[in-house]
Amino acid sequence: MQRLATIAPPQVHEIWALLSQIPDPEIPVLTITDLGMVRNVTQMGEGWVIGFTPTYSGCPATEHLIGAIREAMTTNGFTPVQVVLQLDPAWTTDWMTPDARERLREYGISPPAGHSCHAHLPPEVRCPRCASVHTTLISEFGSTACKALYRCDSCREPFDYFKCI
């Protein structure tokens, strides 16, 4: 996420707050800023440029989210606005805020374990319901491409795990 310098125009702070209200359509308890999808907010002349990185390049919600950003900006008088799709570097779960990880757990989805640079290591996947680490992978593919399906061996409940990407 862009660090806000003390010399940033006051509207930049307002825009970050505005964008932090746009929910992710697949996980509505998280916003696009919680996930780290908004990379930067820049004033360019009389308008605004928003850097946006989807969670993966084929994400079906990309156009919807770009439209939501444009609508929020326009509705609140921040025009003209240009949303720049930034695919490099690719989005990573490392960009998620700590608060987002906790809200995932409260929502019933086990948050990503570890960091993306260690994604090849088998993670200790904790059950979001009972906090047990005695879990079993059922399927690499869960309800969305970024999730895997697990079952807790302690409470026997199935749950989604947000893959470390």
UniProtKB/Swiss-Prot annotation:
Q: What biological-process GO terms show up in the record?
A: phenylacetate catabolic process
Q: Which residues belong to the signal peptide in this entry?
A: none
Q: In which pathway does it act?
A: Aromatic compound metabolism; phenylacetate degradation
Extract the Pfam families matched here: FeS_assembly_P (PF01883), Zn_ribbon_PaaD (PF23451)
Give the matching InterPro entries.
Fe-S_Maturation_MIP18, FSCA_dom_sf, MIP18-like, PaaD-like, Zn_ribbon_PaaD
Q: Which domain of life is it from?
A: Bacteria
Record's note on what induces expression: Activated by cAMP receptor protein (CRP), integration host factor (IHF) and by phenylacetyl-coenzyme A (PA-CoA) that prevents PaaX from binding its target sequences. Inhibited by PaaX.
Q: Give the record's subunit note.
A: Monomer.
What does the UniProt record say this protein does?
Possible component of 1,2-phenylacetyl-CoA epoxidase multicomponent enzyme system which catalyzes the reduction of phenylacetyl-CoA (PA-CoA) to form 1,2-epoxyphenylacetyl-CoA. The subunit D may have a function related to the maturation of the monooxygenase complex, rather than direct involvement in catalysis. PaaD could assist either in maturation of PaaE or PaaA.
Listed PANTHER family: 1,2-PHENYLACETYL-COA EPOXIDASE, SUBUNIT D-RELATED, FE-S PROTEIN MATURATION AUXILIARY FACTOR YITW
Query: Miscellaneous notes for this chain?
Result: PaaD component is not essential for the reaction in vitro.
Official protein name in the record: Putative 1,2-phenylacetyl-CoA epoxidase, subunit D
Which species is this UniProt entry from?
A: Escherichia coli (strain K12)
In the UniProt record, the gene name given for this protein reads paaD
